[in-house]
Structures are given as C-alpha cells and as structure tokens.
Amino acid sequence: MEENKLSGNKPIQLATWSNQMGSPENNGNNANNGSDVQNVIQKALGLIRQLNNNGLMSPMEEEHSQPSSSQETLSVDREINEQGRLRLLMQAKDDNTRKEVGTYSSPMDSAYARENMLNVLQSLVTHLNQAVSQIQQLKFKNMILTSNENNIQSRHEVEDNLQKQQFERMKCQFLLERQSLKDQLRKRENKIVKYKQKIIEKNKKLNNLAKVLNQHAISDTSQIDSFSSSVKKTPSSTTTPQEMKSDMLNTLGILATHVLKDEIDDDSGNQTILQLAAGSISNDCNTTELEITCSPEMGRTITHNRPNTKDESIQDSHGNRTLQLPKMKSFSTIDGSIKDIK
C-alpha cells in the first residue's frame, strides 16, 4: 500500500517484524483466531473487488441497482426480436442511473462505507499482527528445538566416538596381554621340555651309577668273605680280666726267656746278633711288631712276625678282644753287654 489512507483519517499500519517474543498465552486460541482471520480476509477481498470494479456503493444504491437489473432481464425476455434496440436503451439507462447515483449520493453514505471499510481493515491488521507474533514464537521454538536436537545429536556422536575409542583401546590392551601371556606360556613350556630332558638324562645316569655300585658291592662282599675265611681264628672260651692279666705276664716271661737265651748264645758263639726285619717293608718304622695269640686251652704261644703292622696285639680265640703290647727293641753288643731298651 502506498499510504493506506481513504478519507484523510489515520493510516492503517501493518505489523512489522520484531525480535521480541510474545507470551505463550495465545497458543490456546489459535483455532478461534484462525477462523476470525479467514472471515476478515474474505470481507476484505470482497471490499477490494468492489473498489476495483465500480467503487463503493451505499446499501440504497445496491437496492436500486438490483431491481433495474431484474427489469432489464425481463424486458430482454419479452422483446427477443428487438435485442439490439433494447441494448442501446439499457446502456442509456445505465448511464443515466450512474449519473443519478453520483448526483444524489449523500455524504453520510460515503462516510458509513468508509468507516465500515476502516473497521474491516483494522481488524484484518490486528489479526495479521497476531499471526505474525505467533509465527515469531513458533519460529523461535523451532530454533530452540533444532538447537537442542543438534546438541543432543552432537553429544551422542561424541559419546559414541569415546566409547569406540575406549573399546579399541581395551581391545588392543587385551590383545597385547594375550600375546604376552602366550609368550610366557611358550617359554615355560620350552623350559619344562628342557628340564624333562635333563631329568631323564640324570635318571639314566643315576640308574647306571646304581648298577655300577651294585656290581662293586658284590665284588667287595666276595673279597671280604674270602679274606675272612682265610683268616679264621681258633675258638676259645671267653676270658676274664684276671686271665688276661695272667696271659700278659706269661707273655712277658716268655719274652724275657727269649732274651736270656739270645744272650747265652751270644756268649757261647762270641758273636750272635739278632736283628729284626725293619725298614725294608715300611719307610718310617725300624722295629718289628709281634702279634701273639694266646690260647689257655692249648697252653702255648704262637708268634707271628708281621712287618706291615706297627703294634703288638694279643687276640683271644674268638677275636673279640685285642691286647696291645709296647714296642720292644732287643739287641746285644760284641762283648755281650745288653743295652737299655729305648
């Protein structure tokens, strides 16, 4: 509209777009407002058509125009043969009626029409403003909802990405742990196989050593049996300590008689030297060791010269007790004198 003004009164202003939001109280009256807007729009369209066609007419003019049009139709029906003449007459009548309406129209009718049109347009403008405010509210709500939806969607995407990353990280960690456990298991299995082989080898060696020991034990027992059978002692009754003392005295007496006999033989033969075997058999010892076995039943003594032994021993018939005698050296000089025993 250029000025939206009809008769010099205040102009009709349409609603302008504003960034302010209205209250949501009008949401419940959307249906009523929509029906009112449609009615007002229809009325406004009718008024605009009238203004574009013939201009605005009063109700009286509309009543005059309607019977004239009906009379014209009736005259056309009656006089079919004189259509051309009647048309000319009707055009002349229309021109006359228009002139009469223009001359006899009162200013009150025009003011009423203007007021009616202004009211209709004003109501139309108000309804349009309400519709614009509702549209703004709905757009703002739509914008908020879309932003919330985008935020929720972006948050879900971020959470999904984080969960995927966590899953991949845990999967990689589990794979590494599984591989390390497999390596440890393989190493331990290899160690077990190696130790099994070593244990088998050691068992074989132990079995071989046990066989060798058994063979040597059999040979040693056979040697011991042969040696014990060769050195069997004559059986005798067990002796008391007093008998052992008497036996020791007897042996000492026997030794003394032997010494005296040796001295007498030296005097008669002018030189008799008794030397006992020493040094050739043992490297450290120059004396002979006498082992005298005593048997009270036999009543005699048996002397054995053993160069390998160092101590003089007296054994009974059963070999249970052994009497150790001191080492004795006996020798005589050329002139027959006896030296002390050292």
Curated annotation (Swiss-Prot):
Residue ranges, annotated region (Disordered): 1-36, 57-76, 299-322
Regions of compositional bias (Polar residues) in chain numbering: 15-25
GO biological process: donor selection
Effect of inactivating the gene: Leads to a defect in donor preference during mating-type switching. Does not affect FKH1's overlapping role with FKH2 of regulation of the expression of the CLB2 cluster of genes during the G2/M phase of the mitotic cell cycle.
Comp. bias regions, Basic and acidic residues: 308-319
GO cellular component entries: nucleus
Task of the protein: In concert with FKH1, plays a role in directionality of mating type switching by controlling which donor mating-type locus is inserted into MAT locus during mating type switching.
Note: Present with 2120 molecules/cell in log phase SD medium.
Quaternary structure and partners: Interacts with FKH1.
Listed name of the protein: Protein FDO1
Organism field: Saccharomyces cerevisiae (strain ATCC 204508 / S288c)
Lineage: Eukaryota, Fungi, Dikarya, Ascomycota, Saccharomycotina
Gene: FDO1
